[in-house]
Amino acid sequence: MIDITLPLTDIHRHLDGNIRAQTILDLGRQFNIALPAQTLETLIPHVQVTSTEPDLVSFLTKLDWGVKVLASLDACRRVAFENIEDAARNGLHYVELRFSPGYMAMAHQLPIAGVVEAVIDGVRDGCNTFGVEARLIGIMSRTFGEAACLQELDALLAHREKITALDLAGDELGFPGSLFLSHFNRARDAGWHITVHAGEAAGPESIWQAIRELGAERIGHGVKAVEDRALMDFLAQQRIGIESCLTSNIQTSTVASLADHPLKTFLEHGVLASLNTDDPAVQGVDIIHEYHVAAPAAGLSREQIRQAQINGLEIAFLSDSEKRALREKVAAA
């Protein structure tokens, strides 16, 4: 179902949600951190979703073991490098990796700006080694509150030239976007693109707020948009992209089943929706699974899957010339 003549992208992919189980085991042993299991086979149920979680917050706890072993900046650099290696193995030409430096720093009180620098270094080295093109999106973890998000923002702005966009993720219901208006004003002043997790746990009003008040050019997940016809029209007319993550939305109980997922409706409505993974290691999936298994199960035709692939590059945070160069590179391969 993947069109090999077109660039394959993943523009909603959490770097700190894609820490390999083997790496968690390795780092746990290296730093003498007590893990819930001592073999790869027995560790996986603790770090990977093996059945549907009751809600988004429950799903997010599966990410915690990955960051609990980040006891040094070198460990952060390693997982960033491995994220690019994983992207290359999946056949991705372009990936936007998003990460929350405060979340990665928290367990071992690492310097947040140091985490940002380590991630930048690891991703750069990975891109040079594996030939994948990547951009970084900084996340503010709303769950930890406004002050913690300000610390994350300051650390990200210290490396503003290496960061492409700002995102807001975490507990959407408990920490609405209205708490973070000044944060996003600063991000836009820095020249960054804006994407926001919205309409995943909360309703269409969260998406409207992300667009109108935070300046979102893309929406992460956005599944509740289908509940508001005016919003659907607005998304299509204004070319505001939706970063769809099929398997993730089932695992978080955001959507009841793949057959109920709104991605097909988005595409039929002319919304620029794309296919992405979200947290591949935690979910136990990759981009190939999303195209070959999840998308057909969600009712997408072959042409709709191809359109979603096209949309992934269309709404990527790249210039027109960068997109053109990537298309030409893939076409010539």
Swiss-Prot record:
The keyword Zinc applies. It holds the Pfam family A_deaminase. The active site is at 200 (proton donor). Its cofactor is Zn(2+). Its EC number is 3.5.4.4. Binds 1 zinc ion per subunit. CDD domains: ADA. Keywords: Hydrolase, Metal-binding, Nucleotide metabolism, Zinc. It is an enzyme of class 3 (hydrolase). Substrate binds at residues 14, 16, 170, 279. One of its GO terms (molecular function) is zinc ion binding. Zn(2+) binds at residues 12, 14, 197, 278. InterPro entries: A/AMP_deam_AS, A_deaminase, A_deaminase_dom, Ado/ade_deaminase, Metal_Hydrolase. The keyword Ubl conjugation does not apply. GO terms for cellular component: cytosol. The record marks 221 as: Important for catalytic activity. One of its GO terms (biological process) is nucleotide metabolic process. It catalyses: adenosine + H2O + H(+) = inosine + NH4(+); 2'-deoxyadenosine + H2O + H(+) = 2'-deoxyinosine + NH4(+). HAMAP family: A_deaminase. PANTHER family: ADENOSINE DEAMINASE (PTHR11409:SF43). Catalyzes the hydrolytic deamination of adenosine and 2-deoxyadenosine. Belongs to the metallo-dependent hydrolases superfamily. Adenosine and AMP deaminases family. Adenosine deaminase subfamily. This is Adenosine deaminase. It comes from Salmonella typhi.
